[in-house]
Amino acid sequence: MNLIAKTRMFMPGPTPCLPEAIAQALVTPMHHRKDDFKNLFREVQAGLQQVFKTRSEVLILACSGSGGMEASMVNTMAPGEKALLVVAGKFGERWIELADTFGIERVTIQVPYGESVEPAQVAAALEAHPDISAVFLQATETSTGAMNDLEGIAAQVRKREDVILVVDAITGLGTTPIRTDEWGLDIVVGGSQKAFMVPPGVAMLSISERAWRRIEKCGRPRYYLDLLRERKAQAQGQSAYTPAISVIQGLKAALDLILKMGVDNLVANATLQAGAARAAIKCWGMQIFPRVSGNAVTAFIPPTGVDPSKVMKMMRDRFGVLISGGQGSMKGKILRIGHLGYFDFLETLGMIGCLEIALTEAGAELEIGSGCRAALEYYREFGRSQ
């Protein structure tokens, strides 16, 4: 038992928040039409450009990441146009749900949970369907931990000047290299509650000039998520409607830290946490679920006879550690550990120790301490390589 109760969040999101961000979010909200907030808003936009690695403007919306996904689709797909959807899990399936909701004709590349979509598959679909006008995909599929070859897929899409590439990078930003301008990514969607270390409530979209040309001629009705209306307002340091003021105040504090440490070091931190967790899991003889893993999430398959729900319950009730199970078709079959947010190796090491006990008491056969030793060895080697 924990005599002093303290919750530690190792889920894919929401994630542990930066204390300075929480402190700023608790300050009395600024007036969003006054100059002091406009100046703060512009500073946040400039900071986001550095995280996204883009010179294009980054719009800030008061909604979840799913709202950002919806905005990216309804503003770019005119009635009668066809989209290519790249689907590798539950959040890829959200592209399907959005397209079907708005009556958008679609071609779908769908792979089994745990797999990644290959650039050659995207190239083949574009060749077979020359009327495709946009490609929608995830950088990392949160439901499985799988990572797509974003750079390789972008290279195939860029062979078609008339096609835009829209990327859900909600768990990719800050955990995986995302080079928006260098790779030619037209719209990249982010969310505040992941590697940015602040509460939910803000979606961010970087938008290329090629994407803006499509948005300007898109005849699909939209209101709250009208990016043209937002672009006009945000050029003046404000949003079209009331923004998530407190979250933006917290986001400014988080960006101050991220830019001070360096965006690449934020990615390196996620790489370290993921590598340590996977070293332990492999030491226990368990299988990492996805064929190609990103750094945002580690998904693994417990031994036969070990109930993931019992492991999660013990982690929560006995240690105050929150981890996640599977989603969609993998519900009840895998466990997922998040590596984004405000935590470090010491916390990851403690989580591994707790997980060893929970797995053992749920029926797994493993040596207590073996995973921690594997994680420590990984940490030592990681430090030597930096």
Question: Can you say where each PLM-predicted feature lies in the sequence?
Answer:
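Conserved active-site segment immediately N-terminal to the catalytic lysine
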Residues: 181-193
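Active-site phosphate-binding strand-loop segment of PLP-dependent enzymes
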Residues: 117-174
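Buried hydrophobic positions in well-ordered alpha/beta secondary-structure cores of metabolic enzymes
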Residues: 13, 25-26, 65, 99, ...
